[in-house]
Amino acid sequence: MRFANLEMTFHRCEGSPAAASGGTWAMTDPSMLDDMRRFGFNLYNTANNHSGDFGEGGVTATIRHLEERGMIFAGTGRTLEDASRAAYLETRHGRVALIGVASTLDPAAIAGSQGVDMPGRPGLNPLRFRAIHHVNARHFAMAEELARVTEVNAQKDYLIATGYSSPYPEGTMPLGGMNFELNDLETDPERNETEPLAIDLKRTVAEIREAKRQADIVVVSVHTHEMKGRDTMVPPEFLETFAHACVDAGASAVIGHGPHQLRGLEIYKGAPVFYSIGNFIFETETVARQPADAFIGKGMPADTKVGAYMDARSANGTRGYIVDPHIWEAVVPEWIVADGKVRDLVLHPVTLGQKDSRSQRGLPRLAEGDEAKAILSHLKDLSEPYGTKIQAENGVGRVKLGIKE
């Protein structure tokens, strides 16, 4: 198995640009899929925050181009059932199942179920979550007062009154899309937490259990940009909860990606959980086209060229991804599986050439020397809270595996 996250749509404008994108409206010519095969990849995730950049037309065109090439993918489909279904790869040593989900998304990109008398909706397999802010009585009263003064909940209150929406749970206070919950005791610590929506967690767990019956190993791919608090390198609680549930259901590994940088590695009950392995190919600055919405949103004319737009977005290379060295660092994990369990795990550090020219920046190469040591040391630090032991040895990282309850 050689896995990749396809954070791109592949078509020739068969879909119109969506009103909102994952950041850059991501589209390239379908022939680029042939390059992915030449790289040696054979199993792909397609559920991410760019899946819906070109609407349903972009989703279905990408699916068609993948299918025409016999490329095995999971995470998007013509219906929710298709998008959430495991994809199977046959190898000489056994069958691998892949399930793809994304938490970072535009609601319009979510796939829909087939009804009795209505068609399903093309899109991605979602992992939605609920954010809760636990506060004391004084701060809860402040939220109530803000809601009253600003009338920020007026539309929601109207929908509740007319029966189109459910009442707020007791002890909770929504405020413009945020959910505040009153602590049981005044001495309870105030905190923020997130939890996966039960409907999405249940659907994914059920598919893992089915895939476990049908395959020798099951891999779950999850695309998550969300973070805990303000630290982009720390995964949110709902992602940890989700990953543990996946392993409990039978997943051999969970591969996370999304924040464009490394996050910690956890060994949970003997299974590796990569909260983010970073980028591999990251050429976001050299897309051929962007819709007028992108330019107008920056206060630029609709006929602006892509290069000028990228200069404006990065303030001529002084802000954003370009100036953050961790965006241009990653690892390529390599492991051996026996009896459905990961037995040997090696991490190959990769650099994407932060200081290269725009045309070359984002292409991967194996890191060497001090650069390799720095990447592995960074990942080791991120993984320490999980008790994971990473040993740097001859330019690669070796992970000590063991059952960790």
Region annotations inferred by a language model:
Residues M1-E405:
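Acidic, metal/ion-coordinating pockets
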